[in-house]
Amino acid sequence: MKMEEMSLSGLDNSKLEAIAQEIYADLVEDSCLGFCFEVHRAVKCGYFFLDDTDPDSMKDFEIVDQPGLDIFGQVFNQWKSKECVCPNCSRSIAASRFAPHLEKCLGMGRNSSRIANRRIANSNNMNKSESDQEDNDDINDNDWSYGSEKKAKKRKSDKNPNSPRRSKSLKHKNGELSNSDPFKYSNSTGISYETLGPEELRSLLTTQCGVISEHTKKMCTRSLRCPQHTDEQRRTVRIYFLGPSAVLPEVESSLDNDGFDMTDSQALISRLQWDGSSDLSPSDSGSSKTSENQGWGLGTNSSESRKTKKKKSHLSLVGTASGLGSNKKKKPKPPAPPTPSIYDDIN
């Protein structure tokens, strides 16, 4: 006897019917659930009533095939600029300007990469300063951290002292030092006055211009005869840093036309006149010329040319001497009107 016959032989007819009914119910339930899920999906996806579609709604989605119109029936404008949405700032930008805008917005271009790196470095410095502030409460004291927040970024030439470009002769431009200074400034575009001490400021203002630029906020390192700035600006800088008792240092001049004395001019004129009196008079020159022509048989052109040259040189020397003497009598020019200064903003 088989095992199936042994298991079913001990069951009653009622139990067999119950088992058959349960199996039938499971099959019907599975088939109904599958059908319901298919109908639900077709309705949600929109393809359940494809065969019984309304003709009016079909006209709304009908493909248009006419010249000058696109498939939706709209007028096609080929000159209309296409717009793209920036993924970073969500702005609508023309397609022709999308690539450069994306470089600047994401910090991937030449200039924008430097700006982005600078922003990242500043944010890292701020985070580091905040963490240090939690450790030490006195880290932001003005006496100790005055210049720490405004440290300039080191140049590549400063990072590499063995660079061949550093051995080249430096041109004396505005903000550059041509000679070795007791205080060595690494910034070639000017000196930041905020990082200098009182002694450094005093020594700098006695030998250099020191006027603060309106754009870079740095001091000019040219000499005291800087043509870009006036004496009034230099005097204002010294009063601002050294107090009202500060005086603009005098500049030694290698050639001073105003120092010519009238006595020297008179002596020069008299000497030139004495030298001129040693020449022959016109009458004597005429007699000498005739005697020379008769005695030696020479022409008079050479003697006349020499005398005209002497007279011209004599007149030119007298004119220069009188011009030098008249420099003393010239009136000084009125001072230039005061220019608007930037120290009101600093104060």
Swiss-Prot record:
Region (Disordered): 116-184, 275-347
Chief localization: nucleus
Keywords: Activator, Chromatin regulator, Metal-binding, Nucleus, Phosphoprotein, Transcription, Transcription regulation, Zinc, Zinc-finger
Phosphoserine: residues bearing it: S129, S131, S278, S281, S326
Biased composition regions of type Acidic residues, renumbered to the chain: 132-141
GO BP terms: chromatin organization; positive regulation of DNA-templated transcription; regulation of DNA repair; regulation of RNA splicing; regulation of transcription by RNA polymerase II
InterPro entries: SAGA_su_Sgf11, SCA7_dom, SGF11
Cellular component GO terms, alphabetical: DUBm complex; SAGA complex; transcription factor TFTC complex
Domain SCA7: 196-263
Family according to the record: Belongs to the SGF11 family.
Protein name, as recorded: Ataxin-7-like protein 3
Encoding gene per record: Atxn7l3
